């Protein structure tokens, strides 16, 4: 049995605690953590120079050049006009494993006039994994609005229910876009969820109706989650070190979890990268 390594990181458009936007540093930090088959990066910018002048360029193209053996998958959550063309912001997947299918899911954004908020989505890429396939979903949930974040976790739980049901009762195979995919072993859901483990949104995903298992306790038992935020950047995160970035997996995948590591040393972003290893049947598919 081989394995698939998946990295998740909110790179904050490459902005480090030192105030520099440095995508080569992001790439080097990813490689230092491990040889990831799939990278799931949040807060990737095209044209949003107001975030930082160095974020005005095409970060998707730049990151794709830094990982030439990986296929880029980018569908923006935010897509706006700008003086130099479209401005886009969202989640990027870079996959060395063959990408079999891509779906972007717009997440709920109920009205919340009390706080600023933005459109969020979940980017789904089904990739070849051994003799079958694995569904990898990355997201970045709403930070300011608790109501929107709660609705978004509910939608993610609902999606997992749909995926599981389709796996148990597949449709007949057709031609062209109706063609079937290889059997999908389950879902890996990762990203910046913007909630702590004691928020109700966490229970929506990991409770009986959520369909997901938190990979950290599944691997590390009762050990506290390694902090993924506020480790180095106390200006943005005065509450200090805590976890808000997670890997969740389908219950069927829990026995296949082989490792989960967090790099708490890097300050190349305001948040920390995580690397999950999942066992897959047969040789790795690349």
What are these regions (language model features)?
Residues 58-66, 92-95:
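Short, electropositive alpha-helical surface patch
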Residues 16-20, 46-58:
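Short, flexible/disordered intra-domain loops and linkers
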Residues 1-34, 38, 78-79, 83-286:
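Active-site regions of metal-assisted phosphoester/phosphodiester hydrolases
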Residues 70-78:
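A short acidic/basic microdomain associated with nuclease active sites
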Residues 67-70, 210-211:
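Short helix-capping segments at alpha-helix termini
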């Amino acid at each position: 049995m081989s394995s698939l390594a998946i990295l998740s990181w909110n790179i904050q458009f490459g902005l480090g605690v030192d105030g520099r936007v440095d995508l080569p540093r992001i790439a080097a930090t990813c490689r230092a953590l491990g040889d990831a088959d799939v990278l799931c990066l949040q807060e990737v910018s095209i044209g949003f120079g107001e975030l930082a002048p160095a974020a005005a360029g095409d970060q998707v193209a730049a990151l794709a050049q830094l990982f030439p053996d990986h296929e880029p998958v980018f569908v923006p959550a935010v897509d706006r006009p700008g003086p130099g063309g479209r401005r886009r912001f969202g989640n990027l997947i870079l996959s060395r494993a063959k990408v079999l299918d891509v779906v972007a899911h717009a997440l709920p954004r109920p009205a919340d006039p009390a706080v600023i908020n933005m459109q969020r989505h979940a980017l789904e890429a089904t990739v070849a994994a051994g003799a079958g396939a694995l569904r990898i979903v990355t997201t970045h949930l709403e930070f300011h609005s608790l109501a929107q974040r709660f609705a978004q976790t509910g939608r993610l739980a609902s999606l997992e229910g749909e995926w599981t049901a389709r796996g148990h009762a597949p449709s007949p195979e057709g031609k062209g876009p109706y063609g079937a995919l290889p059997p999908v072993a389950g879902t890996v859901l990762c990203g910046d969820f913007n909630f702590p483990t004691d928020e109700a949104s966490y229970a929506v995903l990991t409770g009986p109706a959520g369909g997901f298992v938190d990979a950290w306790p599944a691997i590390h038992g009762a050990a506290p989650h390694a902090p993924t935020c506020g480790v180095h950047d106390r200006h943005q995160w005065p509450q200090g070190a805590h976890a808000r970035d997670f890997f969740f997996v389908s219950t069927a995948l829990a026995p296949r979890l082989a490792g989960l590591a967090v790099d708490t040393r890097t300050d190349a972003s305001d948040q920390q990268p995580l690397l999950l290893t999942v066992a897959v049947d047969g040789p790795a598919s690349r």
